[in-house]
UniProtKB/Swiss-Prot annotation:
Location of Phosphothreonine modifications: 122
Active site residues per record: 11 (tele-phosphohistidine intermediate), 89 (proton donor/acceptor)
Catalysed reactions, semicolon-separated: (2R)-3-phospho-glyceroyl phosphate = (2R)-2,3-bisphosphoglycerate + H(+); (2R)-2-phosphoglycerate = (2R)-3-phosphoglycerate
Modified residues (N-acetylserine): 2
Protein name, as recorded: Bisphosphoglycerate mutase
Regulation: At alkaline pH BPGM favors the synthase reaction; however, at lower pH the phosphatase reaction is dominant. Inhibited by citrate.
Matches recorded under InterPro entries: His_Pase_superF_clade-1, His_PPase_superfam, PG/BPGM_mutase_AS, Phosphogly_mut1
Amino acid sequence: MSKYKLIMLRHGEGAWNKENRFCSWVDQKLNSEGMEEARNCGKQLKALNFEFDLVFTSVLNRSIHTAWLILEELGQEWVPVESSWRLNERHYGALIGLNREQMALNHGEEQVRLWRRSYNITPPPIEESHPYYHEIYNDRRYKVCDVPLDQLPRSESLKDVLERLLPYWNERIAPEVLRGKTVLISAHGNSSRALLKHLEGISDEDIINITLPTGVPILLELDENLRAVGPHQFLGDQEAIQAAIKKVEDQGKVKQAKK
């Protein structure tokens, strides 16, 4: 029986989403389409009369800005927002900045699918020579984390994402939900997938089939033990949402040349 409701989402579209590049921990901002997605998400939640008590985001701009735009549409700008690196996107290591379609051409679509969607396959780690290494690890936000800088990931599988996310869920977010607070989590594709895996009990094998579009609110109904009582629900125009899911799934495929 449903006792609690949780809303989560993947942030709105950013420039590198549109360019089909692995963004990961690079602090790309929302583009105009992403801002519109966030505003539409806020309108959708307003139409359903959601009133939030707390918002949780990653420390990346696109996650935080999405939350701000949603709260603005709701007229709930005063709601506290808390940010943690533990909700960050998956660290894609050496793949950061690379184009997914080009990677599919170089390594095959199945390898790219495994890097993007599988549970326990880790991409090659980022090295100091990587063009975005210093931009990430010299950033002040990572010098005030709850772990030392040298213990932050250099690459992650989805399993790794879940392992660094769970302590934050268990110690910070879950207690607020259990107190009856209405919580919004504005995160990323893979941190959201990892949390869905945990709450819904999705198997290691089946998680590869879970795809989340940008800027679409997801409703989870939870029991007294904070386990999902049914599958997650995308809120909004279902036909448009399915088209958006397919768009994400196709990012790691080689487009057919026009005749």
